[in-house]
Amino acid sequence: MPAVRIKICGITRVEDALAAAAAGADAIGLVFYAKSPRAVDIHRAREIVRALPPFVTSVGLFVNASRCELGEILDAVPLDLLQFHGDERAEDCEGHRRPYLKALRMKPGDDIVGRAAAYPGAAGILLDTYVEGVPGGTGAAFDWSLVPADLGKPLVLAGGLTPDNVGRAVEQVKPYAVDVSGGVEASKGIKDAARVRAFVDAVRSRRRDET
């Protein structure tokens, strides 16, 4: 299988972004949602993005942000990709001069394929754990057997991933990418460099085992 891309989300410090890049992560995520313990402001986000080495993708995570708020952030922070985690419609996600991912939470009984089809312009679909009232970062995994065989878009797997279970997740789901936040933290918003390395190694070793 092709190399599974890896995103380390909830980055709040330059040193954590650099540690993620050094470990081999393909992307880092910055949370622009004030209610999150991993939220960053524009100044900190710009500092982190400017410190990234070449070819590491910067992703901005938003939850029901207004166009005005989005515009202010995008004018100040050179993000490569947007990730929408709220109740945004397709038209809310488009027109920002950036490709985007739409996160869908795996609520039991939902038609995930149908919901994904409502975002034809999305670069990919991220599947996360459903917890009532929580848009993401729950730290809980969902039943991977519920993931459809074909979403019609690149699939990003999130929700409760850790260095201990991500290898099994990659083997079972075969996603385009995996996204982790709490599973590689020392505390909320502070990454553990050793756990980041272990997570990346677990993903890469699973691919080597299959070649």
From Swiss-Prot:
Keywords: Amino-acid biosynthesis, Aromatic amino acid biosynthesis, Isomerase, Tryptophan biosynthesis
Enzyme class: isomerase
Gene Ontology biological-process entries: L-tryptophan biosynthetic process
Pfam families reported in the protein's UniProt record: PRAI
Source organism, top-level taxon: Bacteria
Pathway connected to this protein: Amino-acid biosynthesis; L-tryptophan biosynthesis; L-tryptophan from chorismate: step 3/5
Family indicated by similarity: Belongs to the TrpF family.
Name of the protein this chain belongs to: N-(5'-phosphoribosyl)anthranilate isomerase
Annotated source species: Pseudomonas aeruginosa (strain UCBPP-PA14)
